[in-house]
Amino acid sequence: MRTAQQEIDERTKLAGNNKFELLLFRLGESPGNGQRELFGINVFKVREVLVMPAITELANAHSHLMGVANIRGQIIPVINLPAVLGCQPKNGLTILMVTEFGRTVQAFAVEDVREIVRLEWDQVLPAEASHAGALITGIARLDGAIANTRLAQVLDVEQILRNVMPVSHEELTREVVGPAMTLPPGSSILVADDSAVARSVIELGLNAMGVPFIMTKTGKEAWERIQHIAEEAKAEGQTVQSKIAVVLTDLEMPEMDGFTLTRLIKQDARFKSIPVVIHSSLTGTTNENHVKSVGADAYVGKFAPRELAATIRKVLALD
């Protein structure tokens, strides 16, 4: 029988090969067509799945916050996921998905959980390409690129969490992120993140740091941009390092994940000296160890501007 750590290690190895596991679930009938669509969340973000426990309602809470549940002594907020997406569960909310990401623990109530599927990231289309809503990061083609493949909507749980349980963050100013950074003339920080809320926070942070940046939405887009910049630099008689000071990348992204992007950069003689910082809500020792194995220079959790600024200074030796 495999241990929990063995399962984690196996999933971590998947990530290094541009693969991941998606937990599929249903929320009830969709508001548009009444169909019971499939939704998904990366298994790495799921701590456990439980039969719905007792919920204690909270006074004056957000309408989508059902209350809190006592899970083995830990008080965890419970979000009504069908209500967030406008779905109508016909069989009630029977399952609780307890999740952990971005250094917080929260649970999502759903109608039912279906299965775990193993996919490659290139089976996931970015939200913009599929005209999905603001709470969707991508559409997963569960059976590959065949005509009648099943589809699952990959939720932007970070955005959902911030909508339902907004956290007050300190204003992103020079006092927070430190003095302005000076990059070599003509160079920028290249960012890759599929989450709209994460991109907006990163943009605010980098603006406060006073550094120019290039924003991309997937690892594939970032990789293509790096190669394009390399060609431009070559034509100008310069190195790509004079154009890209740091690559700041998420881990979970449609088409190509951050692990694969990092490995491609570090295995290419033209790019391997460019510092790569993994910036992800998938915090934890296992992920941080795997980051080191693919050659990333640093790892920092999302929505921590002080730490992000300090990490960028460190990899650029600006301290």
Model-derived regions, located:
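An acidic, low-aromatic, low-complexity terminal/linker signal
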Residues: 1-221, 225-237, 242-245, 251-260, ...
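Acidic-histidine catalytic/liganding microenvironments
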Residues: 268
